[in-house]
Amino acid sequence: MESLIYMSSHILSTEFLDGQGLGNQLWAYAATRSLSERLGFGFKLRGFERFKGSAFLSISEHVNISIERDNCTSKLILPTYHERQYYDPELKLLSTYFDEEVLNLRSSHDLKGYFQSEQYFFGDIEKLKHYFIIDAKILEKNSIPSDICVLNLRGGEYKRFKDLILPQSYWQNAQKNMMELYGISKFLVVTDDYRYAKKIFPQYEIVSGNVGDCYAVLNSAKYVVASNSSFSYFPIKTNLNSPIVIAPQYWSRFNNSYKRWAAPANFYADWLWQGADGEIQGIEGCIGCVQDTIQFYRSEYFVSCPPSQLNQGFSWKILIPTMLRPHIKKFLSYFFPTKIG
């Protein structure tokens, strides 16, 4: 447990949830902890037993809170602050960007939302290396040479959404760019979906199955081609090798005809962004699109409603008993690895 510099009378808390992916957990943790520091509050993490990185990452359950107050706080129900989100019916997603209103909190709150903007770190990315300490043995075991590029392929449930899954051309163009720009010709695949990766990249070594190994490989790579998944952000940003990263332009709606960044929160200034045509853009070529997207939501989205009122449409999934779904999904993935996983 790290030393407590001061004891705050107010706290910000967040909770790890059932079904929440590791990337989303790390964003919720890091953003809430950073905001608590900014506001001079204590920090409290709830649901640590649901942390998907506990086998290889060390994090703090509370910061700047006395043990007595921590025990008391665990029994309290705090008021909730919901990060502002924008439902975009044309892109069919909930979009977010830096919610500056959270800085106006003057009392203890529980934060709920995605909180995936770098602006929540207030210009200090280096502190992430203190927030997340990776197990040295796991990192050493998964260290890779500097002349290998990691392809962080996301499959799984992404394959059910044609607007979300990245086309094979994205990966082919990114490999070509790595070769032409940096002379890289060796590639390694890190993925949550081994069968899908084997279908797409049969010629490459694949790291899959153990999330700690996947995280550590990304944390040691000098060159990375990222998917539009939140998982890769923290192993890349805490990587001591200052990696070169190519990521998909517009993020979760690659090549969308509206040319909106989906979401503006998921724009990271020091990454390279590749379009559907294979062209690479830096911050200068993308920041205008990001700012235009934010302005569009600010000017056009001014009606609030509860999440239950959003039109989610009908899904055949509701007709399948919950206990049977993972077994059916696994069975079908053997026959349709590029569609189901």
Language-model regions, residue ranges each:
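Nucleotide-activated donor-dependent transferases that construct or modify glycoconjugates
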Residues: 2-19
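Secretory-pathway luminal glycosyltransferase catalytic domains
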Residues: 10-12, 48-177, 181-182, 281-341
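A short, glycine/small-residue-rich beta-strand->loop->alpha-helix junction that serves as a flexible
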Residues: 17-27, 158-166
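Donor-binding and catalytic core of enzymes assembling or modifying cell-surface/extracellular glycoconjugates
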Residues: 22, 168-172, 177-266
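Histidine-anchored nucleotide/phosphate-binding helix
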Residues: 26-37, 172, 176
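A short beta-strand-loop structural module common to alpha/beta enzyme folds
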Residues: 41-51, 191
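Catalytic binding pocket for nucleotide-activated donors in carbohydrate/polymer assembly enzymes
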Residues: 237-305
